[in-house]
Amino acid sequence: MFNYVLKKVLGTKNERELKRLRPLVARVAELEPRMKALRDEDFPRLVAEWKQQVREKGRTLDDVMPEAFALVREAGVRALGMRHFDVQLIGGAVLHSGKIAEMKTGEGKTLVATLPCVLNALSGRGVHVVTVNDYLARRDAEWMGRLYRFCGLSTGVIVHGLTDRERQQAYGSDITYGQNNEFGFDYLRDNMKFRLQDYVQGELNFAIVDEVDSILIDEARTPLIISGPSDESSELYARVNAVIPSMIRDQDFTVDEKSRTIVMTDAGVEKMEKKLSVQNLYAPEEIETLHHVEQALRAHHIYRNEVDYVVKEGEVLIVDEFTGRLMPGRRWSDGLHQAVEAKEGVKIEAENQTLATISFQNYFRMYSKLAGMTGTADTEAEEFAKTYNIDVVVIPTNQKNVRKDAEDVVYKTEGEKFDALCTEIEQRHGTGQPVLVGTVSVAKSEVVSALLKRRGVPHSVLNAKHHQREAEIVAQAGRKGAVTISTNMAGRGTDIILGGNAEMMAKHEVGPEPDAPMEGEEEQAFLERKADWAKRLEQALEKLKAQTAAEHEEVVKLGGLHIVGTERHESRRIDNQLRGRAGRQGDPGSSIFYLSLEDELMRIFGSDRIQGLMGRMGMKDGEQIEHPWLTKAIEGAQKKVEAHNFDIRKNLLEYDDVMNQQRRSIYRLRRMVLGFGAGVPVVEYEEDPKTRKKTRHEQVFTWADAGEHMLDLVEDLVVEMVGASCPSRVADWDLEGLSANIREQFGVEMKFTPPVGRPQEARRALEEQVFNVVEKLYRAKEEELGKDPEGIPVLRRWEQYLYLQAIDQQWKDHLLSMDHLRQGIGLRGYGQKDPKQEYKKEGYEMFVQMTWRVKSAVIGNLLRLQLVRQETAEELEAKRLAMQRKALQRITASHAESAGDGDAKPAPKQETVVRQHPKVGRNDPCPCGSGKKYKKCHGATEAAV
């Protein structure tokens, strides 16, 4: 009651946020006459002035915001013929403040993004606009690029298939558009490279995520994985697959469709053991066979052809469950993809080993500032707040929404439902009203298509099998009499304009734009052909604009676009997205969902409550029921699924957070090693755990730093080895064992006498003694190898080469070990232990051991290094680049099925710190004034890995 009164008096949080931004809109309106008076050439000049003020004179972006927004509004009019509405200015301010702007379909999100993009580009640190597919990235970069170029800013686009040089150029632009996976994979690929100069991505400063719910929530259940071929044989997949058909459901195994898992019964285990000639499937040596059996059962009984995947040209291609699009290049992990290939009788590809992985949550949380926009985020506001620490602000529409949403209609069987919805589509088509039919899978879209064909209703189908003309089909879905069947949210990001999209129709009529001279064609002839194409396009556009305007009026009179949902999705948000395709910009529209008790959502999550409601309403075969109670019960089922999926994502994040700390530590070390002598600043971020504030550090590492770092590694190894052989009780000291370990690690013979005095001092003396001997060996090796023509000790270059080799090999093995730990950790729950805590603890111990192996390998190999002939710096560089090419050729980038993790927050504004003083030597006094040596004071806390 108290909260209700407060809301009445103070307004909701959303209302207060909108009220706070109203003065900005008024200020931009005041500046509009001044901007209108500018000449075209004044726009880039003003932007350049603001850039200088922000970078050199300390002017903040918030100070510049009113002027910048007013400039962009006028630039939109001149470059695009589009003026930002007041509500779009509010949306731009929300994005700039690092929040999510919920804006309904057709409200111009693409144009809204130009406001914070231009403003944040003034910092010179880059702006990334993240889209759901390559088509939208290209379209938006080209379309909005006209506005950016008008303001003197450069635009790049990141899509599949670009070379590293092209990617570097795109990321070097003021504003970079790109597909979400490409950004994540570029980050992982960069951290597998062997020269800092080859990195493409640069700083993660500010990201605006378009369709933010799709990217940060729907796709967050599956991490990005870069993998390479492993030595596993595919023979076992085929052998197991051959015996799976003999397994009987509910007798030999049970299926939990909700969690997509399968559990074998005792009878099933016994049957499998006989069929595979195995004594005990649960014996340690047969765990791999058991895993293959479980994955084969899932492939046969959970993963369905034309729903979860399609088989195309002898290849199993995953279907995106949220968009219905095919995802070529992506493979399920953990042997599941191979099991599906065996089931479908296609070639079984070799299983891959993970080389690098990151979740979307942890990738996007690395940005200094993160914002997003979508038509449907409010239902997931809690998850955005908990996982990303981002608020959702609902932006009012420019014109009132007049769409009519009918209550759900429910039938007993799927057949009755399809029959009824096809009758409705036929009737609407008869009047000329356009209809968009939303389905949840490829198979269901083809069922509806077949039924409409039988009735003689012309229609277009848009699913994973027919996606080539996606944008064109969706853009024309608003034409008179059009019937379009679409899986889920295919075509999202393309507006459905009543009467048709004149621009798309003109391009289709005229044909593609000439992009290169034909064979033997002179440049002048090519330019003339291009000019002729532009002229014909303009003529077609003029003609079609008049035609579509007249058709628009007719369609409006018929009631606008009618949406027919064939099934409720497991998320309310996806249903809202489908409904949101109708009623854009104040246009009329309507929507209705046809459901049946056989639908997946009702069957798995609907429980007996909905069945009971139907019984009480006295439902008969072929009869439909509409009731608000029923709609509420279905919404309750959806909330259950949303909560279940949130738990999965939270789980993924909690596990990935463990890996995230380790990944960042290893990548930081790797960048430092690459930085030795590179002359390129290495940028790192230090986060205050309390305030979440990030401080930006720039540091240039010299070849001298490399030598110091190697001695730090020697000291770490010596302290560890002495500590292991010399515990607190002198009686337990194993000096012979210490001698053997030193011989094995450093290749030097040392004899030790029993200690005299206190154990702690004796241990320190031993450490000093061993360190001095190894340091002499190291200096001798440096002298022995001499210097290259540039005056750099040859040992330095070999240190870098061997260090990178050790890091990459050990990290790859560590990822495999962590995978195995993750797969088996759930069993700890049976021993009354928390699996997550156990994973954190053991994962940390494994990481410490891995870093020890890296140090041991580097120093051991360095001290044993014998050069048959002196290699030049160029030869070493060539060897390093060959290593990089070989590694990158063998990798596969994919989404993998996984489980995962928790609370994440984007960082506040960063500060830059550039080191002004020289690097402090290991044995120099610590600058803090403690009187201790640097290596024993602050040097200990700053030591890498």
Curated annotation (Swiss-Prot):
Cofactor: how bound: May bind 1 zinc ion per subunit.
HAMAP family: SecA
Family: Belongs to the SecA family.
Region entry Disordered, spans: 892-945
Top-level taxonomic group: Bacteria
Organism taxonomic ancestry: Bacteria, Pseudomonadati, Myxococcota, Myxococcia, Myxococcales
Role description: Part of the Sec protein translocase complex. Interacts with the SecYEG preprotein conducting channel. Has a central role in coupling the hydrolysis of ATP to the transfer of proteins into and across the cell membrane, serving as an ATP-driven molecular motor driving the stepwise translocation of polypeptide chains across the membrane.
Organism: Anaeromyxobacter dehalogenans (strain 2CP-C)
Protein name, entry field: Protein translocase subunit SecA
Binding site for ATP: Q88, G106, E107, G108, K109, T110, D495
Comp. bias regions, Basic and acidic residues: 902-914
InterPro entries documented for this protein: Helicase_ATP-bd, Helicase_C-like, P-loop_NTPase, SEC_C_motif, SecA, SecA_CS, SecA_DEAD, SecA_motor_DEAD
Bilayer topology annotation: Peripheral membrane protein
